[in-house]
Amino acid sequence: MKSCAVVLVRNSSEYIPAFLAHHSRLVDRIFLIDHNSSCDLRPMKGDRVEAKRLDAEYFGQAEFINWSIDYFNLKCNYDLIFTIDIDEFLPFTGGDDIKEFFNNYTSSEIVELYWRNGCVEESGYLNENSEISFCRKRSSTRKLVYNSARTKRFQVMMGNHNAKHPLFDLGPVQLRPRPHDSGLGLLHIPFLGMEGLRLKVADFPKNDFADKIRHSVNLIGIEPSSDWLEGEISRRDYLRLVANYRTNQINRILDVDESDFERVKLFADLGTHIAEWRSRLNACPAAEVRSANPAETARLSQLKAGQFGYLRQLRKTLRTDPEGGVRLS
């Protein structure tokens, strides 16, 4: 059994060393897709890490993840595919845990992991001393895990919260498998203190990110008129914001307090590995950041998972160069 993780990252350097140290002990290979970061992450490539750089400003998570899965032929080369974000950490401690997880769901095509949101008190790089408070309650936001030994009919949607299942790339002709809830929580550290949230809001498109955060803020009862992002919020509101991060329905809001969080040192035994990855990250050169391009946006926004010929269009649209760059053809 072989497993891999695919991660699309824009900046978020504070997460990268801990993410790579944690997941390189779990899966056989990590596919790190650098999406127009201010430093070039291709030097992070190594024995268990593949790295590409997307030379595009357009925020197309699904398109770039699906292109990566297709380009690296992951559905044929790996039995278990985790498509996660740089702030998400699988709830396992070693490769044997991954094998046990796979064996538990050998007959399942799609498995669900639901966020267990957590927070750290300090900003800066995650490290072996980071004490993370994870909510014991799972949120209503799920991520999907693909058992490609059972199915190759999947195309990621919406940051991998959902998927399409076209038959032979035939668009509306779909065979939808029923996802199985693993009962496990995907450990999610959405921001590193309020300053980290401010940086995250600045890094991503307003309509794709900031507006969704603001909707969650309104649902948990923080006054819309309050300067919640720039100012200070109460400890209770902060914990409720963490637990309900990106929750968009009032009936799914978790009512939490300090007792609903447990403190975990997730990276306690990874100090040496985190330091090694941090050193490699510090050696990555600065990169030219692509600015918004209306023609690029118009072209890529036409590609939607599940449409007829979607993968063929992705192959025509995105091309690689010998240096590991990916750009529009």
Describe the residue ranges of each PLM region.
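Active-site beta-to-alpha loop of glycosyltransferases that engages the nucleotide-sugar donor
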Residues: 2, 7-21, 36
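A structural signal for isolated positions on well-ordered beta-strands in alpha/beta enzyme cores
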Residues: 4-6, 29-31, 50
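Short, acidic, metal-binding catalytic loop of nucleotide-sugar glycosyltransferases
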Residues: 21-29
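Conserved SAM-binding loop
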Residues: 34, 85
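Active-site-proximal specificity loops/subdomain of glycosyltransferases
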Residues: 39-83, 91-92
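Boundary detector for helix-to-coil junctions that initiate low-complexity/charged tails
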Residues: 285-329
